[in-house]
Amino acid sequence: MAVLGITVALLGWMVILLFISVWKQIHSSWNLPPGPFPLPIIGNLLQLDLKDIPKSFGRLAERFGPVFTVYLGSRRVVVLHGYKAVREMLLNHKNEFSGRGEIPAFREFKDKGIIFNNGPTWKDTRRFSLTTLRDYGMGKQGNEDRIQKEAHFLLEELRKTQGQPFDPTFVIGCTPFNVIAKILFNDRFDYKDKQALRLMSLFNENFYLLSTPWLQVYNNFSNYLQYMPGSHRKVIKNVSEIKEYTLARVKEHHKSLDPSCPRDFIDSLLIEMEKDKHSTEPLYTLENIAVTVADMFFAGTETTSTTLRYGLLILLKHPEIEEKLHEEIDRVIGPSRMPSVRDRVQMPYMDAVVHEIQRFIDLVPSNLPHEATRDTTFQGYVIPKGTVVIPTLDSLLYDKQEFPDPEKFKPEHFLNEEGKFKYSDYFKPFSAGKRVCVGEGLARMELFLLLSAILQHFNLKPLVDPEDIDLRNITVGFGRVPPRYKLCVIPRS
């Protein structure tokens, strides 16, 4: 029995030595960036805090430098940390790293749409979507009008609270939801509409679940875990329900399509599909259009909604900042006129606060995973084709040289000594390069106009002492999720 135990131990040790030898051989032959030694099957999982992987990446960067390799399970991942490495990757090597690393929870969207697509249709779908969105006013006067009109509905909903405590999640969320719905479907929803609330709850739940430790594990071990119970099943179910809804809307549009008079984003894609239908490899199908619309709907709603919700919580914590914003709004806009984009140049403090909210909350700290499209030499290392590459946006947004005291909320990070707005090239919450967020212009406009409109008409009132408000996120993974809270909005006299 003792001999058997010794034999098993020796065999186990030999397997480990063999693994080390093979790992070193692969590592040296490719000249990969340095990194911690991975264990069989689990890789470097034990060296990462699943409750805050971005922070773990920061610690590893201190040890191995701004470009390092980790293994998430069997997946080789190259992490880029700091302004120089991230900027070089996103802008100077944007083609080589334009692939999308797989996110198993969104496998149903694989090679479709524009966010999670890593297939041959991605470039053309993205290019045409951007052109179509510009035609419907993305970042221009058309969307300013849409946001201003929707802001009126938001202000009315806030008045209905009559100064009583309420959870802002869906009240605030319905505004960007309706703005993007108008672009996609030429439709808007009442703030109490059951279908709208259902879709927003799916968006909100998925953003939360994707940021939990279990989903970090699942996305790296999906081959082992896909048939096991867990919250990943809920995410996948939610994704399917969202796609079923957008597919139904696409089919409705298809039945009533008039190619001479496109009504919205869906119609424009359907017209292109009709032009392409005789191709042996059609770029557009009803399924691909539905996923593209689902991508836009989720991203266009949840990111702006969460940023606004987090921003209001920050202002509850800092009433002195809210007071300065009221003064600037009163001076530039006055009590009755709706805020406009042209006001931004005269409102440097509001502009700085909006930027600082995005920097401080660091909504998607590790970006979405990229993938090397070919063998690439980067800062003296070789990154093989198919390698997942993560450019950490938090390493820019929390850079201590660019933003002194980055852990503190300070609008002064974006103001010069004269009190004028100061842009920072480190400000990349929407990423950059080939995979930059297609809705950046819309989101920036929404944040400025909606926050200005809310503060033009209301004072924010917390339910607890501002010093007791905790701004820490409740979980971080795919994104940073703010704590749930209630507040009161008091009409300004």
UniProtKB/Swiss-Prot annotation:
Q: Which GO terms describe its biological process?
A: epoxygenase P450 pathway; xenobiotic metabolic process
Cofactor(s) needed: heme
Membrane disposition: Peripheral membrane protein
The UniProt entry, under Gene3D superfamilies, shows: Cytochrome P450 (1.10.630.10)
Name-wise, this protein is Cytochrome P450 2E1
Q: Where in the cell is it found?
A: Endoplasmic reticulum membrane; Microsome membrane; Mitochondrion inner membrane
Which InterPro entries does the protein's record reference? Cyt_P450, Cyt_P450_CS, Cyt_P450_E_grp-I, Cyt_P450_E_grp-I_CYP2E-like, Cyt_P450_sf, Cytochrome_P450_fam2
Q: What is its EC number?
A: 1.14.14.1, 1.14.13.n7
What CDD domains would the database entry show? CYP2C-like
Q: Name one Pfam family in it.
A: p450
Keyword Membrane: yes or no? yes
Question: Which GO MF terms does the UniProt record name?
Answer: arachidonate epoxygenase activity; heme binding; Hsp70 protein binding; Hsp90 protein binding; iron ion binding; oxidoreductase activity, acting on paired donors, with incorporation or reduction of molecular oxygen, reduced flavin or flavoprotein as one donor, and incorporation of one atom of oxygen
UniProt family annotation: Belongs to the cytochrome P450 family.
What residues does heme bind to?
437
As recorded in Swiss-Prot or TrEMBL, the protein's gene is named CYP2E1
Task: Tell what triggers its expression.
Answer: By ethanol.
CC annotations in GO: endoplasmic reticulum membrane; mitochondrial inner membrane
